[in-house]
Amino acid sequence: MSLTDTPNANRLHIALFGRRNSGKSSLINALTGQDTALVSDTPGTTTDPVAKAMEIHGIGPCLFIDTPGFDDEGELGRMRIERTWKAVEKTDMAILFCGGDTSAELSKETKEPDFTEELYWLEQLKAKGIPTILLINKTDIRKDSQALAIKVRESFGDTPVLISAKEKTGIEQIRRTILEKLPPDFGQQSITGTLVAENDLVLLVMPQDIQAPKGRLILPQVQTIRELLDKKCLIATCTTDKLPETLHALAHPPKLIITDSQVFKTVYEQKPEESKLTSFSVLFAGYKGDIHYYVKSAAAIEMLTESSRVLIAEACTHAPLSEDIGRVKLPRLLRKRIGEKLQIDIVGGTDFPQDLTPYSLVIHCGACMFNRKYVLSRIELARKQNIPMTNYGVAIAFLNGILDRIEY
């Protein structure tokens, strides 16, 4: 991804689900106009989810996800289906193929279309609030496309889109249907919310330490600056050591100061009384997750003991650095508060345990590399198991005793 590309985390995630050899990969290629996904008559060609970014007129940046067939078999097949389930957690919108190969969906007893698996997956997608487009592919070789469409409508209660991915017919209808079923709240989230308005002065305090990539800013900083520019705010920036000089140079105190969570305490002690304070991580807690649940869950820190177990989850999978906030600084703060024997497990990327019951608390990063749907799915998992879940910025503010004075 270049600096001018929309991050995948901010794209509408559209996942394709269906049986093996149903034409999911062919549709990806037809939609993107490229041979993105491997296509073969052999069932099970797609062994891992394949993602392709593209723009759709009227919608904007999208990420299409081609998943392994949910009717896969054997031990390897079971593992592939698990990958497909993981893709569901990131899905904003689904395209469900009704049937696989032209004969595979027929019941052995009745010789009628058997949509048992498709109906099960539709039920699971609906339970997660994922808008789903029903689709019948291979109309170029099916003699019963219209009859099958009637059966789908009767079984699913919705009208399918008929296409031939191979001949590229019906592709425009798919694009129109995506636009029609677009989640109404998608893309409506704001990083800074109602904290600032046009002409407000905002000061960004950004430490350029070993974690900061040389020659560029980290993604949350870039996205926040872009939003502030769109809001027509006045923006000033500085490093932590130049905060006093910067405040002195400003004609009046900033309306809002946004800092890195790891220097919360330092900035709080130096900020003007009338300036509001928050951090990039706290802002992203609301932008990507559920800030109110995070703030409520932070109180669980007070209940931790040395026999407790805490899970720290990072979206990135970078090699740990000497002063890494998630792997070094945050554990140091926790153990200083709770005790050196506090057990802390750390996971990165898509590694996230489905069973959270061994943990007294989950602390997540700002998740700038994940889409909102994926973060909310993790929060929902924690909620269902009654496990408190907060994020880096909220936890650090709590540990510094200033959470009630932080804006979000």
Report the location of each language-model feature.
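Conserved GTPase G-domain signal focused on the G5
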Residues: 23, 140-148, 163-184, 286-288, ...
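Conserved beta-strand segments of the P-loop GTPase G domain that flank and frequently precede/overlap
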Residues: 95-100, 134-137, 162-164, 204-206, ...
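P-loop NTPase nucleotide-binding/switch module
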Residues: 1-12, 135, 152, 182-186
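C-terminal effector/interaction modules appended to NTPase cores
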Residues: 1, 19-25, 215-408
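Conserved G1/Walker A P-loop phosphate-binding module
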Residues: 1-78, 82, 86-89
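Conserved nucleotide-binding/hydrolysis micro-motifs of P-loop NTPases
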Residues: 44-45, 69-71, 100-104, 138-143, ...
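Conserved C-terminal guanine-recognition region of P-loop GTPase G domains, centered on the G4
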Residues: 52-60, 65, 75-159, 190-194, ...
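C-terminal end of P-loop GTPase domains and the immediately downstream helical coupling element
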Residues: 164-251, 312-313
